[in-house]
């Protein structure tokens, strides 16, 4: 009779699950320290202030957390989407109350097409951002005065490293470009906004299933964004 111990097939899987949990916990720990941990952003935003200002600081932090979770965890440069940044209950960084903002995550190695139709906005602009060191910089900005529209107000705008032949509206993607922000200005909230859509021009493989490494990387990016909120 063999009484020796033999590893069962499930044990390598269990070990990998424990390793995955550890990596996830590390990512969550970074986020916890950035938000509510002692000495984190929550303390930096509220320390030394009266109770009302402290409460506003923590409310600001919750808004940043909700927004950055959507931007850093859910948005994907391989499946681009324009997400509304501000709303009546999500406002931060001294936004303009007469402006409608949308955001998309980009990959500078890919090509994108924005298409849509003008509404009743007074101003329409597309702004590219990227990190130079630790500073988020404006890399390019194109507004309606720089663009061509058809008689019905429809337009196409291509974002790419090189300008394609025959394209009327184009913005160059710098190799550090990571974010697109659109702005529409209004004088009346009843004015109709522009219709905006974004799509990927390159054919790429379907997105893989989520991995612990990928989610952990996004959680750490989320932590870094939140940690810079008070700077």
Sequence positions of predicted segments:
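A compositional/structural signature for long, glycine/proline-rich flexible linkers
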Residues: 5, 10-230
């Amino acid at each position: 009779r063999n009484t020796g111990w033999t590893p069962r097939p499930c044990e390598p899987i269990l070990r990998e699950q424990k390793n995955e949990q550890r990596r996830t916990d590390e990512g969550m720990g970074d986020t916890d320290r950035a938000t509510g941990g002692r000495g984190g952003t929550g303390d930096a935003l509220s320390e030394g202030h009266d109770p009302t200002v402290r409460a506003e600081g923590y409310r600001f932090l919750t808004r940043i957390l909700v927004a950055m979770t959507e931007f850093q965890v859910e948005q994907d440069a391989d499946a681009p989407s324009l997400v509304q940044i501000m709303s009546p209950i999500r406002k931060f960084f001294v936004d303009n109350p007469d402006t409608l903002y949308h955001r998309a995550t980009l990959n500078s190695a890919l090509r994108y097409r924005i298409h849509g139709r003008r509404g009743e906005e007074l101003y329409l602009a597309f702004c590219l951002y990227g990190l130079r060191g630790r500073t988020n910089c404006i890399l390019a900005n194109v507004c309606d005065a720089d663009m061509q529209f058809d008689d019905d107000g429809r337009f196409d705008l291509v974002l790419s490293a090189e300008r394609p032949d025959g394209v009327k509206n184009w913005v160059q993607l710098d190799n550090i470009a990571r974010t697109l922000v659109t702005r529409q200005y209004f004088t009346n909230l009843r004015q109709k906004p522009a219709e905006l859509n974004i799509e990927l021009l390159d054919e790429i493989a379907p997105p893989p299933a989520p991995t612990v490494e990928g989610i952990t990387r996004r959680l750490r990016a989320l932590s870094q964004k939140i940690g810079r909120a008070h700077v």
